């Protein structure tokens, strides 16, 4: 049966995903940045309270995936922390200035991760040549690749996703970006074995008092009275699609 991974930004979201049928969680912070490394406090509390597999993301900032020496040193420390806390896997990715997998740095990450299953995230979609990148990641021993098929969403990238799957059994190709219950069947019919979804939406803050005269963000237009949350019903609906597909 296909595996359902849900992207979560808090312990509450992780518990919601677990209760509604998620098989695995990608744990992140900062949804507006596309997902950054969670704090140590979040890592510890999720590790204590969530029973299903949780793979934290290792990403020190938003933007591109070509990191300074200082940023990369911090990434290695975060990898070691995730390993020490007992997580079964992690999610990360590093590119060089030419849009290739940074082999030297990824080798260091793989060594620091040890037995943990490593997912190469959507830095893959920013690679100059996805097929060369896939071969490099296979040689490194990366467990899976999260990809939208180098398109803005995985529906439009499905032809490339299918080509990547046809390259071999490893790494596993996990489709993500815009995957929802209403289009999930297309991925299952195409032979995708793992799917990734945020399965959520922005929700209004419970704050009653709101000072609209200033912003804590460098983006003055940012809505600071909203937060991203996993929708349990959406997770359950996606799981139902997978179960029904397996039964047919």
Swiss-Prot record:
Identify the Pfam families for this entry. Answer: CutC
Keywords from the named record: Cytoplasm
In its UniProt record, a GO molecular function of this protein is:
copper ion binding
User: What is one term from the GO cellular component aspect held by the record?
Assistant: cytoplasm
Compartment annotation? Cytoplasm
Q: What is its main location?
A: cytoplasm
The record's section on InterPro entries has:
CutC-like (IPR005627), CutC-like_dom_sf (IPR036822)
The question of whether Oxidoreductase is a record keyword is answered with no
PANTHER family found in the cross-reference section = COPPER HOMEOSTASIS PROTEIN CUTC, COPPER HOMEOSTASIS PROTEIN CUTC HOMOLOG
Q: Which HAMAP family match?
A: CutC
Give the UniProt family note: Belongs to the CutC family.
Q: What is this protein called?
A: PF03932 family protein CutC
From what organism does this protein derive? Citrobacter koseri (strain ATCC BAA-895 / CDC 4225-83 / SGSC4696)
Encoding gene, per UniProt annotation: cutC
């Amino acid at each position: 049966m296909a595996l359902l991974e849900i992207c979560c930004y808090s312990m509450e979201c992780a518990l919601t995903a677990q209760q509604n049928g998620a098989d695995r969680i990608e744990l992140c912070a900062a949804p507006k940045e596309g997902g950054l490394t969670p704090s140590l406090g979040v890592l510890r509390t999720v590790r204590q309270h969530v029973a299903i597999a949780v793979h934290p993301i290792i990403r020190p900032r938003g933007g591109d995936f070509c990191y300074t020496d200082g940023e990369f040193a911090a990434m290695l420390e975060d990898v070691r922390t995730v390993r020490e806390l007992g997580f079964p896997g992690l999610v990360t990715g590093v590119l060089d200035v030419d849009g290739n997998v940074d082999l030297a740095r990824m080798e260091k990450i793989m060594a620091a991760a040890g037995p943990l299953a490593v997912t190469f995230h959507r830095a893959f979609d920013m690679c100059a040549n996805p097929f060369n990148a896939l071969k490099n990641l296979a040689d490194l021993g990366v467990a899976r690749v999260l990809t939208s098929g180098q398109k803005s969403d995985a529906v439009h990238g499905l032809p490339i996703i299918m080509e990547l799957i046809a390259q071999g059994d490893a790494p596993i190709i996990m489709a993500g970006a815009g995957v929802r219950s209403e289009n999930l069947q297309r991925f299952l019919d195409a032979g995708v074995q793992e799917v990734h979804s945020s399965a959520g939406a922005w929700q209004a803050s419970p704050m009653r008092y709101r000072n609209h005269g200033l912003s804590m963000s460098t983006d003055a237009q940012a809505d600071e009275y909203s937060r991203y949350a996993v929708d349990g019903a959406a997770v359950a609906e996606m799981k139902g699609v997978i179960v029904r597909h397996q039964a047919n």
